[in-house]
């Protein structure tokens, strides 16, 4: 938690990596990376690991400590704020993906959004733990907002990322270039020609998967085993 950035530009962000030099921890918040940008997913793991530790060890005093609770609020300030995006996903800029930066995964890559879902759920558990010991109206408001965000995020992922043989058939028949009130039929203006020809035969009728990314006009239909595995683990 001492590595969490407190500067205005990157407040709440965790470094992609850090090194030890002469007894001091030197964190990389993007100043050493290509594009000079830190990884979005690097900041989302610690609440998950923190809650798992508290749950397994029973060390509630650590979960309710001022340092942990402050870290939770800094992270939520970073994630739950007004943006130009009307969706509950976390926008990931180009080069801001710790797992594999050159794979064209900017936008809303599955691994990051699933990890965001787990991160917010863990933050809720840690805040509820704190609320048992100390009442706060601000904390109650943050809990309501975070729960709603988790719900909206899961619904968004199931609606736009989950594909089966049946949904592919529907997607190919949807109208494109829609505007106004009818846009809900094809919100991201997915063109039939961008759907891979092999996808229908590969899916058959046995199941489905979460696609790699959803972007206007050009979803990423690649299958990412890590993102789908995390979705199963985290209850998406």
Task: For the regions a language model picked out, list residue spans one by one.
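Catalytic cores of carbohydrate-active enzymes
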Residues: 9-11, 93, 106, 115-236
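Generic alpha-helix signal with a bias toward terminal, lower-confidence helices
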Residues: 26, 30, 52, 91, ...
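A generic structural signal for short coil/turn motifs at secondary-structure boundaries
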Residues: 62-63, 100-103, 134-137
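Acidic/His metal-coordination segments adjacent to aromatic residues that form catalytic metal sites
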Residues: 16-37, 92-109, 202-217
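C-terminal ends of transmembrane alpha-helices
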Residues: 84-94
